[in-house]
C-alpha cells in the first residue's frame, strides 16, 4: 500500500509540474494560427509556466495578455515577428486608458518573452492623417497624427510585474517603445535585446535591469527614461549596453524621482555632449539627482566628463547585480521571486561582466 501511495504521489507531482506547450504557426501547421488564439485557449491561471512556442512568420495582430505565467518563445528572433500599427494619439481619442495602445499589451504577472521581434510600425510606414478626436482641445476637434508621436511596442498595465525579455527586438519609430509601467512593484528584466524608437523609447517605472542590450535612437530629446517615484530604492540599471542613433542623439532624461546606473556601457561617437537631465516640471524631487556611471566610454575615445566613474561610496561595481536590483522590490511585492534571484560575478582581469548564473534561493 505504501508503495502504491508513493507511486501515485510521484505521478501527481509529474502531472502538476508538466509544462503546457502550445505551438503557433501562421501557416496552419501548429495548434493555432494566431498568438491570441493560443492565449485564449489557456486556463486563467497556472502554478507552473505555460509555453507558447511561435514558429517563424509574420503575425499581424495586436496581443492582449491577461493570463499569468506564460512564456512566449519565438523560433528565431529575426524571423518571428509580431507587428501592428498603432498611434497612441489616435487610440486615446476613443479610449479612456492605454489598454490596447501597444502591439503587445500585458496586464498580468510573470510573463517571459524570448526570441521575438515586436514592432509598432506606425512611424515606419507613416502617412499623413488628420482625425476627428472628441477629446481634443481644439475647437474643430481635429488632430494631426505625428510620425514621431508615442508608438508603443510593449506596454504593461493593471499592476503587472515580473516581466522578462531575452533576445528580443522591440521596434518603433516614435516614443515610448518599451513601456513597462508600475511604480510600486514593477520588476523588469531585459537581456540581449535591441530596442529602438523616439523620445524615451526605453522608459521603465519601478525596478529595471537591462544587460547586453542595444539602444537605437531615431528621433527625440532622449533615449532612456525612468520613473522611480514609488520607492527611494527604485532604479534602472543598464549593464554592458550600447547606445547609437541619429547625429546628436541624447542619452536620457527624467520628469519624476529617478535613479540611473550605467555600468560598462558604450556610446556612439555621434552622441551629443549632454548628460541625462531633469525636465523642468512642477514635480517635486525629494531624493536629489541620482545618475551614476562606471567604466562607460565613447566609441573611439574622447570621453565626455559627465559620465566619469561616480558610484556612491558605499556601492562597489562588482556588487551591482540582478539580486541587488530586485532585493527590496521583492519584499515590496510580497511574492516569491526565486526566478529573479540572478547575479553576475566580476572578473577583475576583464573590463566586462561575466554571464549571470542562477542563485537557488
Language-model segments: residues:
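Bacterial Sec-dependent N-terminal signal peptides
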Residues: 1-20
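Sequence-level preference for short, compositionally simple segments enriched
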Residues: 20-361
Amino acid at each position: 500500500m505504501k508503495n502504491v501511495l508513493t507511486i501515485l504521489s510521484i505521478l501527481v507531482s509529474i502531472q502538476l509540474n508538466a509544462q503546457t506547450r502550445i505551438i503557433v504557426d501562421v501557416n496552419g501547421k501548429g495548434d493555432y494560427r494566431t498568438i491570441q488564439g493560443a492565449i485564449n485557449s489557456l486556463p486563467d491561471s497556472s502554478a507552473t509556466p505555460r509555453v507558447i512556442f511561435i514558429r517563424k512568420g509574420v503575425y499581424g495582430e495586436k496581443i492582449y495578455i491577461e493570463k499569468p505565467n506564460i512564456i512566449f518563445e519565438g523560433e528565431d528572433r529575426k524571423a518571428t515577428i509580431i507587428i501592428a500599427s498603432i498611434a497612441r494619439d489616435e487610440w486615446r481619442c476613443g479610449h479612456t486608458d492605454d489598454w490596447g495602445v501597444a502591439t503587445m499589451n500585458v496586464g498580468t504577472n510573470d510573463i517571459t518573452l524570448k526570441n521575438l521581434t515586436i514592432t509598432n510600425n506606425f512611424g515606419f510606414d507613416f502617412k499623413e492623417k488628420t482625425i476627428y478626436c472628441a477629446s481634443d482641445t481644439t475647437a474643430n476637434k481635429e488632430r494631426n497624427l505625428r510620425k514621431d508621436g508615442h508608438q508603443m511596442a510593449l506596454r504593461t498595465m493593471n499592476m503587472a510585474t515580473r516581466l522578462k525579455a531575452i533576445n528580443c527586438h522591440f521596434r518603433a519609430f516614435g516614443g515610448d517603445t518599451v513601456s513597462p509601467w508600475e511604480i510600486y512593484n514593477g520588476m523588469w528584466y531585459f537581456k540581449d535585446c535591441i530596442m529602438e524608437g523616439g523620445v524615451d523609447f526605453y522608459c521603465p517605472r519601478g525596478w529595471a535591469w537591462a544587460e547586453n542590450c542595444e539602444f537605437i535612437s531615431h528621433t527625440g530629446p532622449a533615449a532612456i527614461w525612468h520613473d522611480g517615484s514609488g520607492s527611494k530604492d527604485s532604479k534602472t540599471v543598464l549593464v554592458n549596453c550600447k547606445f547609437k542613433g541619429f547625429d546628436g542623439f541624447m542619452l536620457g532624461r527624467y520628469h519624476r524621482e529617478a535613479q540611473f546606473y550605467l555600468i560598462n556601457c558604450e556610446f556612439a561617437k555621434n552622441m551629443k555632449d549632454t548628460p541625462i537631465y531633469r525636465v523642468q516640471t512642477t514635480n517635486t524631487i525629494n531624493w536629489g539627482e541620482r545618475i551614476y556611471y562606471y567604466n562607460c566610454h565613447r566609441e573611439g575615445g574622447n570621453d565626455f566628463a559627465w559620465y566619469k566613474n561616480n558610484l556612491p561610496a558605499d556601492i562597489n561595481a562588482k556588487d551591482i547585480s540582478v539580486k541587488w536590483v530586485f532585493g527590496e522590490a521583492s519584499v515590496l511585492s510580497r511574492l516569491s521571486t526565486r526566478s529573479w534571484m540572478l547575479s553576475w560575478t566580476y572578473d577583475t582581469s576583464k573590463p566586462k561582466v561575466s554571464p549571470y548564473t542562477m542563485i537557488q534561493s
